[in-house]
Amino acid sequence: MREISVPAPFTVGEHDNVAAMVFEHERDDPDYVIYQRLIDGVWTDVTCAEAANQIRAAALGLISLGVQAGDRVVIFSATRYEWAILDFAILAVGAVTVPTYETSSAEQVRWVLQDSEAVVLFAETDSHATMVAELSGSVPALREVLQIAGSGPNALDRLTEAGASVDPAELTARLAALRSTDPATLIYTSGTTGRPKGCQLTQSNLVHEIKGARAYHPTLLRKGERLLVFLPLAHVLARAISMAAFHSKVTVGFTSDIKNLLPMLAVFKPTVVVSVPRVFEKVYNTAEQNAANAGKGRIFAIAAQTAVDWSEACDRGGPGLLLRAKHAVFDRLVYRKLRAALGGNCRAAVSGGAPLGARLGHFYRGAGLTIYEGYGLSGTSGGVAISQFNDLKIGTVGKPVPGNSLRIADDGELLVRGGVVFSGYWRNEQATTEAFTDGWFKTGDLGAVDEDGFLTITGRKKEIIVTAGGKNVAPAVLEDQLRAHPLISQAVVVGDAKPFIGALITIDPEAFEGWKQRNSKTAGASVGDLATDPDLIAEIDAAVKQANLAVSHAESIRKFRILPVDFTEDTGELTPTMKVKRKVVAEKFASDIEAIYNKE
């Protein structure tokens, strides 16, 4: 199958907009707890009425600052409660939210401010505000910087005070004037070359995403469910899901404290989480490693295989009596503990940003946590395809979100069009023209649609490796297999214009400590110290051989190199959503890549 379309069971009217639901909830269900926010370490209830009052006050404050419809307003902050409130306030006055990662460099922030000509910026911390102050001479359009946290008055208080003299009828008029075709957000996304491009999404794009998500997941997105958002809200996935949750009256909490995520989950007790595959891989690998360190590695291995077998059997008519009995035993011994680590009430998750892998998907479903995998880009307002609660095929990213169509081009590239697809790049007609063909958005991803209409993503078009022998290799297949090993943190497949495929491997710091202990290595030895250790080489070689089973001989990894350091966002090799920056890795570790191909 080359094309599939799913009609929308809803409509988006001329005046439909994102902010409208804030005041609809206030009118229809004022006392319902729509948010919980952290105040001095305690999750504190925020009702629909309280949230609407804060959003209204912030919106009036923006009006008092002279923010006009269509003006760009930057949020330069990590995920937190205030982020969502400010976002709704910006949208309510008809302005355009420009999200910026809290880890952005000064040069990145400068470009966003210059290109968007933003008039107001919300800075999270003192250091963020200081960075922006140092840029003031080069961003003439910026009139106001308000600080969300840190020293001095906070942004919400300042906006409330400033807006106190504004007639609320001003906001009512702004809301009434909103059109679904109006711009809502400008998301800067890096291209293959040059500076980041501003991806323009309209109110209609976001409303289509919100309603489409609800149509596919009425049992996850419904009143009474609980969602903890810990991915960056600057990323379209987290923002779109949190908006969809708000629309469906899911109680939402926010945190960016990833180091203390497990204690947060234990207290918040979400019923659903949204994450990227690397987090699910890490949870699995940590559980496997902890079992090995406790001398229970074999028990965990059998439990993991039982979970996979049970899930696969569910797709074939259901597990038999013996498998059900084994599954019940391991549910008490293993799976229940895994679910407890996520707060005890979590029964489903949404994964996006990269392929999850069929084995991991089957494991989690077998362990009692179904992961609904989706696919999307900034240009598709978040998800353009997602697995459904009642129509799931593990290993795929599901079918189009209602109101959208998918097509596979002759060269395998995935093309999309529909309600969630963006209108173009900000002030960049050339890039917009290049991004579309006959009205279809060229995603840059390679995919396939099976006979049942399920989409599988096989890799990025620009990441395809062409060896010296002319073999095309999609690195994601091998890399996903390698990261499944508990000792491996990241893997980057190389080999463009080279005689064979190679790989750079980084070691998981936590797993490494347990491995050293089990293999009687010096406690203080670093990965660099043991990079050529025969036992470590043998362990990674076994993982490489296992990964190679997923590809042909010509695509298999012939040699690998263990790097002395892991990739991190701080050192520049990972994006905020934990994707590897291949170009950065290739430049930083050029000598290691060359060493793979040096004749010995």
UniProtKB/Swiss-Prot annotation:
Gene Ontology CC entries for this record: peptidoglycan-based cell wall; plasma membrane
CDD domains given in the database record: VL_LC_FACS_like
Functional pathway: Lipid metabolism; fatty acid biosynthesis
Superkingdom classification of source: Bacteria
GO MF term set: ATP binding; CoA-ligase activity; long-chain fatty acid-CoA ligase activity
Record key words, sorted: ATP-binding, Fatty acid metabolism, Ligase, Lipid metabolism, Nucleotide-binding
EC number: 6.2.1.3
Record-linked Pfam families: AMP-binding, AMP-binding_C_3
Enzyme class: ligase
Gene3D superfamilies per the UniProt record, alphabetical: 3.30.300.30, N-terminal domain of ligase-like
Record InterPro entries: AMP-bd_C_sf, AMP-binding_CS, AMP-dep_synth/lig_dom, ANL_N_sf
Catalysis performed (reactions): a long-chain fatty acid + ATP + CoA = a long-chain fatty acyl-CoA + AMP + diphosphate; dodecanoate + ATP + CoA = dodecanoyl-CoA + AMP + diphosphate; hexadecanoate + ATP + CoA = hexadecanoyl-CoA + AMP + diphosphate
GO BP field: Actinobacterium-type cell wall biogenesis; fatty acid biosynthetic process; lipid biosynthetic process; long-chain fatty acid metabolic process
Function: Catalyzes the activation of long-chain fatty acids as acyl-coenzyme A (acyl-CoA), which are then transferred to the multifunctional polyketide synthase (PKS) type III for further chain extension.
Similarity annotation: Belongs to the ATP-dependent AMP-binding enzyme family.
Name recorded for this polypeptide: Long-chain-fatty-acid--CoA ligase FadD15
Organism the protein comes from: Mycobacterium tuberculosis (strain ATCC 25618 / H37Rv)
